[in-house]
Amino acid sequence: EGSKAKSIRVFTSDAPPVAGGTDCASIVDLNTWVATLVDNSLDVNGVKQVAVNWGDGGAISSVIDTTAPYSLVGTVFTRTYLNAGSRVIKQTAYDTIGQANVRTCPPVVLSTFGLSGNARRLDNTPVASVKVVVKKGAVTVRTVYTNALGDYVVGNLKPGTYNVTATKAGLIFPQVYNQPLGPSAPGLNFQATN
């Protein structure tokens, strides 16, 4: 008998993209609360859109590539967090036919910072009730007083640079600190010159 030739067409499925980029553990700088994600999402037919949900309830960062071959590799997404707390970052990559892949990073905990020190007389004895003023720019964010041992502690501060000064009637404390926070800063001590 005769043989018949049949043609067979093989179709391959179009797999969804793979969302990727900066290693999850390296996205957020815990000292500055600044997050930076460099995209490295891939797909055989191209990645048309990448979106980043920063986990803080704010706007989602999103970029769309409208030109073939559709690649957003190297695109930089950034966010500066405004408040302490736990954040879960989710990066979503979309291919040219709308298929999506989500990469969810483990929670990142943003903690506030503190500064501390003591106030002493010229003879090195502690001074109680010294007024310590902490400013960020021109705004006073905290005023505290030293305890009986001359010590003070200021907590719950966000990243930034703080101006720290000390005053008490009858004493002169010449030290002025312009202290970056993130991490915390102990040892901001004041010694009277009289």
Describe the predicted segments one by one.
Residues 1-112:
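Extracellular/lumenal mature domains of secreted and surface-exposed proteins
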Residues 2-4, 169-194:
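Structured interaction patches on ligand/partner-binding surfaces of diverse proteins
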Residues 50-52, 130-135, 164:
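Hydrophobic beta-strand segments
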Residues 72-79, 150-152, 186-188:
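Short strand-edge motifs at loop-to-beta-strand transitions and within beta-strands
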Residues 85, 158-160:
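A glycine-anchored, Pro-Gly-centered beta-turn/N-cap motif
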Residues 116-128:
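Structural motif
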Residues 136-151:
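Short, acidic Ser/Thr/Gly-rich low-complexity loop/linker segments typical of extracellular
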Residues 160-170:
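A short, solvent-exposed beta-strand micro-motif common in secreted/extracellular proteins
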